[in-house]
Amino acid sequence: MTPKEQSPTTLLISSRKDPAGSLIHEELYSFLEDDKRAHSHIRHWHAEERLIYLDGPSLPHDADRILFLSRHASERPRPVLTVHVTGNFGSADYGGRPNTLTPAATGLMHALINRLIIHAPEGYEVMYEATHHGPTDIPLPSCFIELGSTEKEWNDRIAARAVAQAVLDALLMDTSSVIPLAGFGGTHYAQRQTEITKLTRGGFGHIMPTRDIPHLTDALFQDIISSTGAFAIYIDGKSMSGKEERMITGLADKHTIPILGQGDLMRLFDLPFSEYMSIRNLAESLIPGSSIVLHTILEMPAPVSLTIPGELVDEVMKVAAEEFISALDSFPIVHMTGRGKACHPVFITDAAFSGRISDELIHLCVTLLQDRYTCSFEGDSLIIKKLRFDPKKAKNLGIPSGPLYSELMAGKPVEVGDSVIYPEMVMTETEKRIHIPQRQAR
């Protein structure tokens, strides 16, 4: 997310009945006197009534998006700066129409959260709120930014100035790299979604908290996706029942909407989302039901699969799984998990790298095995020689099963009567051959 020379035109709306919104607007005017960059891209409108009761179609339309500057109120007041889009999943208790959602300015919301985190005064929390209240029937993408939660905060000029600075920064940001997400689950104050936006390119539009999931229908799910412009959804599974999570997952599958977790988003880095989806689709065609883990990928315009010997990967995963997976971060590849395996022998990389990557992965596996076993090659076969504890040999030497076996397996000698038994005396060598076709000498 970077500053952008050509920004969308934004309509800033505050209410004369709202002390916090008016104060934020006042501070914005002050900033704009000194910073002319945004003048041509900002329109101002001061409503006479409360914002939540505005009539959407009556609002000015000479802009690309709307940002409402507002106070925040709560039954459990605390100093907080929030961002959310409007709409009602059910009844319209606080403005707007029931069962109606507005288009979300999802990219702007991502920018606002991150700039608020930078500028928030000490003692103020920053977070998304779940979708709630009016106005609805707004034809333009929009969102609220709020300062709360009591008269003390509404009249806090330092906080209002911080919000104004965050707004001005966000309006000038290029948000084209943001991945629009719809969120499901959690409380009204969407802490998990806020954390995701803080750490990743994932930005949320509509967020349906757990309390509103009983309202969810197929039609409403589609409305949430379209009103957000969502590329994918995030499910806070820990905050809901298994039945609720399965219902949401089923709707996502039905409408071919990807489900992304925080880990997925953390690994996306700057990878274009279209390329990420190409990788996911290829992985699904290779191993249905698998999950993907990205490693150091900035772009992958031509994803292809490569396969190395499955026995080789299995051997490495038995003895050096953590080291192997960690080492994959140095490769521009994707590994697949699931269906009983932490790493399948099928990988995805860009076509430009596939030949080299295949050789390097095999070399990595062999190196990790050589650190633990005696390994050699005969032609295209890797020979792995292992020493394993042989209970028959131990028994023949008069060693009773139990703690002494553990000592020997740990490489320690033991005493039986007047005799000292060394570990190598109770070991048997086994040999495993793995065919590695077209292995290149290194």
From Swiss-Prot:
HAMAP family: Deacylase_DtdA. D-aminoacyl-tRNA deacylase with broad substrate specificity. By recycling D-aminoacyl-tRNA to D-amino acids and free tRNA molecules, this enzyme counteracts the toxicity associated with the formation of D-aminoacyl-tRNA entities in vivo. Coiled coil: none annotated. GO terms for biological process: D-amino acid catabolic process. Belongs to the DtdA deacylase family. Disulfide bonds: none annotated. Keywords: Hydrolase, Metal-binding, Zinc. The keyword Hydrolase applies. It catalyses: a D-aminoacyl-tRNA + H2O = a tRNA + a D-alpha-amino acid + H(+); glycyl-tRNA(Ala) + H2O = tRNA(Ala) + glycine + H(+). PANTHER family: D-AMINOACYL-TRNA DEACYLASE. Its EC number is 3.1.1.96. The gene is dtdA. NCBIfam families: PRK14866.1-3 (NF011436). This is D-aminoacyl-tRNA deacylase. InterPro entries: Deacylase_DtdA_archaea, DtdA. Pfam families: tRNA_deacylase. The lineage of its organism: Archaea, Methanobacteriati, Methanobacteriota, Stenosarchaea group, Methanomicrobia. Its cofactor is Zn(2+). Gene3D superfamilies: AF0625-like. Monomer. SUPFAM superfamilies: AF0625-like. One of its GO terms (molecular function) is zinc ion binding. Binds 2 Zn(2+) ions per subunit.
